[in-house]
């Protein structure tokens, strides 16, 4: 058998080399086209650029979590992350306006890379609980981005305690200094308690600080009104310096509203002399001065012969008669003992003559107190509402002199006619598991538990204590009041707490 010469094998090897060269060239062209397409995609404005170092790490993390169904479904929606980042960024820029200057292209790329690098399993877990306690001008933008995707853009509205740390941590960025930024925000009407830092520790501090302060000023992250209130809310006031209140004319002082920004601290003592002879106890109101001295202000006692509870209030501790010159006002209840009205020493319109009605000496209603009935006997503190006349532009009390039952403070309040009146209510106590009781923070002014202890606030500002009252001994109570109450109003409200209320206990 003859074999082919060696030269016959040469053409076959040449053909193999040419075929492999063609395949290699084809692969090179395909690779070049693919690189061009990827380069074009990277240059598109809506594309989030991923960090090259973080891409393999994200892929490995994704592969390790494919077995978890929650993470897998979470990753399935990550395709729209780039649009969500751009939309949230645009919303935040609209909210902040001119307070944030345009960053250079390199800064935008790094921000986009960081956002895309957080798409992996492990980084996303670390950021899962962020921005829990934030509130401020851009809160709506953050809520919208949270509803659409997991990517967070800004951290706006941190507490004042975290603001300095946030500005220090963000000092190396392309943002303006803290003073320039605060000045710009004040010109634009934006709250100064703002930080653009996104460090994990700062977010945790902001969240914990918000939880600690949740019992002071609650705000809704989805309410535009609460955002405006949070932006315009003043910073917590410093402890007020001790001020000695001078009392020249007792009657004038008892009817004058407390000065704004000053808490008038008083003490009520209960004298039970004569109770063995069927008399009611006498209550004395004294002003607590900073030097330790006590100044008498008012005295009150319940009348014996009266269909309803009727407390007479006088500026003379020895003369508690209605016909005396020291009589300044009274507190009267309804038959159930659940509603009380405070009057001055004017004339009752039902007993007044026509000349008296026109002379302006009709009695003035100074306050009304309504206790919520508790006929089912639920355990817990009393619930009360206090209605007082409003204040005019010069901080004087509006005179309310009703001529019939339809013009009284209680009737206006029940008919939702809130013109020229102020509605207050007691602050809801917090249940303490350790002491198994309801507690309120009286700042050391109340030391004994009692169902009579209360704090009066306004619904729009629960931190401003208009009045507080509580027991410090068996027959000694403290009573502190602020603007817009006067001494007579506060003392009468406290007397209503002493009265027995069978339908409220």
From Swiss-Prot:
GO cellular component: cilium; cytoplasm; cytosol; extracellular region; nucleus; plasma membrane
Alphabetically ordered keywords of this record: Cell membrane, Cytoplasm, Membrane, Nucleus, Obesity, Phagocytosis, Secreted, Sensory transduction
One GO BP annotation of this record: photoreceptor cell maintenance
Keyword Cell membrane: yes
UniProt membrane topology term: Peripheral membrane protein
GO molecular function, one term: intraciliary transport particle A binding
Principal subcellular localization: cytoplasm
PANTHER family tied to this protein: TUBBY PROTEIN HOMOLOG (PTHR16517:SF20), TUBBY-RELATED (PTHR16517)
Function: Functions in signal transduction from heterotrimeric G protein-coupled receptors. Binds to membranes containing phosphatidylinositol 4,5-bisphosphate. Can bind DNA (in vitro). May contribute to the regulation of transcription in the nucleus. Could be involved in the hypothalamic regulation of body weight. Contribute to stimulation of phagocytosis of apoptotic retinal pigment epithelium (RPE) cells and macrophages.
Oligomeric form and interacting partners: Interacts with GNAQ. Interacts with TULP1.
Family statement: Belongs to the TUB family.
Name of the featured protein: Tubby protein
Upper taxonomic lineage: Eukaryota, Metazoa, Chordata, Craniata, Vertebrata
């Amino acid at each position: 058998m003859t074999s082919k010469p060696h030269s016959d094998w040469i053409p076959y090897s040449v053909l193999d080399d040419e075929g492999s060269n063609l395949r290699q060239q084809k692969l090179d062209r395909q690779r070049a086209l693919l690189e061009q397409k990827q380069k074009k995609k990277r240059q598109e404005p809506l594309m989030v650029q991923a960090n090259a170092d973080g891409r393999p790490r994200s892929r490995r993390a994704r592969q390790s979590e494919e077995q978890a169904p929650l993470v897998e479904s979470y990753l399935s929606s990550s395709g729209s992350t780039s649009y969500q980042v751009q939309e949230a960024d645009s919303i935040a820029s609209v909210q902040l306006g001119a307070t944030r200057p345009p960053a250079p292209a390199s800064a935008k790329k790094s921000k986009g890379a960081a956002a895309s690098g957080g798409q992996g399993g492990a980084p996303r877990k670390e950021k899962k609980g962020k921005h829990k306690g934030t509130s401020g001008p851009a809160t709506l933008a953050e809520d919208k981005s949270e509803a659409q995707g997991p990517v967070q853009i800004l951290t706006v509205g941190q507490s004042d305690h975290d603001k300095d740390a946030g500005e220090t941590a963000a000092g190396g960025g392309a943002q303006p200094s803290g003073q320039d930024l605060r000045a710009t925000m004040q010109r634009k009407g934006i709250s100064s308690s703002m930080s653009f830092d996104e460090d994990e520790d700062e977010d945790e501090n902001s969240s914990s600080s918000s939880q600690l302060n949740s019992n002071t000023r609650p705000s809704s992250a989805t309410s535009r009104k609460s955002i405006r209130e949070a932006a315009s809310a003043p910073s917590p006031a410093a402890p007020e310096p001790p001020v000695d209140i001078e009392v020249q004319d007792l009657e004038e002082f008892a009817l004058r509203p407390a000065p704004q920004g000053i808490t008038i601290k008083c003490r009520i003592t209960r004298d039970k002399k004569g109770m063995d002879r069927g008399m009611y106890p006498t209550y004395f109101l004294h002003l607590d001065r900073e030097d330790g001295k006590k100044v008498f202000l008012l005295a009150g006692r319940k009348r014996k012969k009266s269909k309803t509870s009727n407390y007479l209030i006088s500026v003379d501790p020895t003369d508690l008669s209605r016909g005396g010159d020291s009589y300044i006002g009274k507190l009267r209840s309804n038959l159930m003992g659940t509603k009380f009205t405070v009057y001055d020493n004017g004339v009752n319109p039902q007993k007044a003559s026509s000349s008296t009605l026109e002379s302006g000496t009709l009695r003035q209603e100074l306050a009304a107190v309504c206790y919520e009935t508790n006929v089912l006997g639920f355990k817990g503190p009393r619930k009360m509402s206090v209605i007082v006349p409003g204040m005019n532009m010069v901080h004087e009390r509006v005179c309310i002199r009703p001529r019939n039952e339809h013009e009284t403070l209680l009737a206006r309040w029940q008919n939702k006619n809130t013109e020229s009146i102020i509605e207050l209510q007691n602050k809801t106590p917090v249940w303490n598991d350790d002491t198994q009781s309801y507690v309120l923070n009286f700042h050391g002014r109340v030391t004994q538990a009692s169902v009579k202890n209360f704090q009066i606030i306004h619904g729009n500002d629960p931190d401003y204590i208009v009045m507080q009252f509580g027991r410090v001994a068996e027959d000694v109570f403290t009573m502190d009041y602020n603007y817009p109450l006067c001494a007579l109003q506060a003392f009468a409200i406290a007397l209503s707490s002493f009265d027995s209320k069978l339908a409220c206990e």
